Amino acid sequence: MRTLYTAALFALTSTSVLAQQGQSGLRIRLGALQPSSAASKAVANQQPGVMVDFLSSKSADGSTITVGYFQGGSGADMVRTVPLMFSKVSDSTSAVPGLGGLYTGTGIGAYLFDTPGSNMKTLWGGYAMVGLKLPGGIFAETQYHYTSRSVNGYSPNGVALMIGRKF
């Protein structure tokens, strides 16, 4: 949990630094990954986490670099997942007054994955998401993470429910 707090503090500090440089564009979200593999569920049914999108003011197509951290279990039975992705978010508008609309997105890249009985391994995969923009830069999204293989029966595949804010 301490690492989760450190990641959130890093994200908030990055927001301040980017704002001072005249750059905008961080999306910070908190939530939990709910793994689909039986081995991962046995260690931690929910893995709290944070994800940060670094948006470039030069990217007109919504491309971002995404870094995340999810952790579940404790002691020797801890599972850690660190997604490092190239992501893209596609906006849409809403017919409902007061809502910013639905959006979709995808990401592809590496998952650094640490499981009981194993050192950190690199798995290749990606995620797909659908989200809802709310007033004030707030948003909620559902993501599905998928990698092509597992490590000792553990896998970071599963659904993540996130809530966040765009700065």
Where are these regions (language model features)?
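N-terminal targeting signals for Sec/Tat export/insertion, comprising classic cleavable signal peptides
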Residues: 30-60
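Cleavable N-terminal export/targeting peptides
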Residues: 1-25
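Solvent-exposed loop/turn segments connecting transmembrane beta-strands
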Residues: 37-47, 72-80, 114-121, 148-156
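A generic hydrophobic-segment detector
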Residues: 121-167
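Active-site beta-loop-alpha junctions enriched in small/polar residues
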Residues: 33, 70, 145
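Transmembrane beta-strand segments of Gram-negative outer membrane beta-barrel proteins
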Residues: 20-34, 102-108
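Gram-negative (and chloroplast) outer-membrane scaffold detector with strong preference
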Residues: 50-118, 136, 142, 159-167
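Short stretches within intrinsically disordered, low-complexity N-terminal or propeptide regions
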Residues: 9, 13, 21, 33-34, ...
